[in-house]
């Protein structure tokens, strides 16, 4: 059985998820939805992907430039089993009634509130909770990054404190900033901690800053331990955790710039780094406190989660099998 998949929103996340779907042997990409005939819409068409307008209102935008679409979102919903909603934050919740009316399952993204779905999802942490569900929310890039590493050491963690150093905008985004400032999130603790708790039960508080960079987020994590753990133990745990990679400053990984260059050297599409990058030298244990620093490629770390979410919703595979299939199809290193 191949699950028929549509992607609503063909931007930063949507186009990466659409690409990932085409790499799965148990899924079929039926079409993608756009609001306007921009370069991404033209590229989708060049790739042979059917393009649909978001609704009747937006059809004129395509017609005015002679861009032939296959119909509207409603037409696409008649042809799919599940829709991946990769629209801007808050839009997914507005779209949900359309999916319910069409009887189509939906995967939402982290820009939506948790109550949009039956479960918030990170594959290696709570895959089983999404089995057979109709509405699943893949959590944000930051939350996914935190959950990947914290879940691996969860049995040792008593309380987590994390500082999120967030990129200001994606590389193609000219509307956001700042470009010459550091912007604190003055709502303390920040929303990231409660979002982690929608996936795993863990005590966590976070703070966040936005800085003038586009390529990655960085997390500075401190964990109060309830059970003894050595630096070597943590290194061993992370080395054996899927979708987490250790990078060494000694080998030239001094910043996020070198980590992204590593992703480029892998010749991956859009220099995706699906894995969470942890600086090996930053891992340290002092008394009952564990410290480490990690980087998150905000454009791609959630992509494999979307694929695994679909498998769980349709019960196509168990957790280990799905993660293994997704990793292999996308060239994820471990």
UniProtKB/Swiss-Prot annotation:
It catalyses: D-glyceraldehyde 3-phosphate + phosphate + NADP(+) = (2R)-3-phospho-glyceroyl phosphate + NADPH + H(+); D-glyceraldehyde 3-phosphate + phosphate + NAD(+) = (2R)-3-phospho-glyceroyl phosphate + NADH + H(+). Its main location: cytoplasm. Keywords: Cytoplasm, Glycolysis, NAD, NADP, Oxidoreductase. It is found in: Cytoplasm. GO terms for molecular function: 4-hydroxy-tetrahydrodipicolinate reductase; glyceraldehyde-3-phosphate dehydrogenase (NAD+) (phosphorylating) activity; glyceraldehyde-3-phosphate dehydrogenase (NADP+) (phosphorylating) activity; NAD binding; NADP binding. GO terms for biological process: glycolytic process; lysine biosynthetic process via diaminopimelate. The active site is at residue 141. NAD(+) binds at residues 12-13, 111, 167, 298. D-glyceraldehyde 3-phosphate binds at residues 140-142, 192-193. One of its GO terms (cellular component) is cytoplasm. Transmembrane segments: none annotated. Its EC number is 1.2.1.59. Disulfide bonds: none annotated. It holds the Pfam family DapB_N. It is an enzyme of class 1 (oxidoreductase). InterPro entries: DapB_N, GlycerAld/Erythrose_P_DH, GlycerAld_3-P_DH_AS, GlycerAld_3-P_DH_cat, GlycerAld_3-P_DH_NAD(P)-bd, Glyceraldehyde-3-P_DH_2_arc, NAD(P)-bd_dom_sf. PROSITE patterns: GAPDH. Pathway: Carbohydrate degradation; glycolysis; pyruvate from D-glyceraldehyde 3-phosphate: step 1/5. Homotetramer. Belongs to the glyceraldehyde-3-phosphate dehydrogenase family. This is Glyceraldehyde-3-phosphate dehydrogenase. The gene is gap.
